């Protein structure tokens, strides 16, 4: 009986964690011919209620613009801020993004990110 209950709880927790992961959609990728070896990448990020991302960095310039809901952002050494639709946020190439989450546990959140990054480089880099 205890094993069956443990299995049920494990399944529930796994489903909850999977539901909270961000959905990322690529909108555009473009070589920036006036900036040698650089490209622009535009994505949308959608957080389910209570959703968040782990600590990360981008090794790129990242310009964030909130479309729906509210998101909480913080880079290492900076203050935690809550952004609402129409507000923006910037991350530099050396910034470690320590907080990135939906501010709500009941409403989804969505934002656009424009990256200026090294051509062919991955969007995410390990946090240092």
Where are these regions (language model features)?
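N-terminal targeting signals for Sec/Tat export/insertion, comprising classic cleavable signal peptides
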Residues: 28-61
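Extracellular/periplasmic catalytic domains that process cell-envelope and extracellular macromolecules
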Residues: 36-37, 57, 65, 82, ...
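Short acidic-glycine-tyrosine-enriched beta hairpin
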Residues: 32-34, 47, 77-94
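Ligand-binding loop in jelly-roll beta-barrel domains
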Residues: 80, 95-120
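Extracytoplasmic
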Residues: 37-42, 61, 78, 94, ...
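A short, N-terminal "cap"/entry segment at the start of jelly-roll beta-barrel domains
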Residues: 2-11, 15-41, 74, 89-90, ...
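Glycine- and acidic-residue-biased ligand/ion/polar-headgroup-sensing regions
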Residues: 58-77, 87
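Histidine-centered metal-chelating micro-motifs
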Residues: 52-54, 72, 89, 93-102
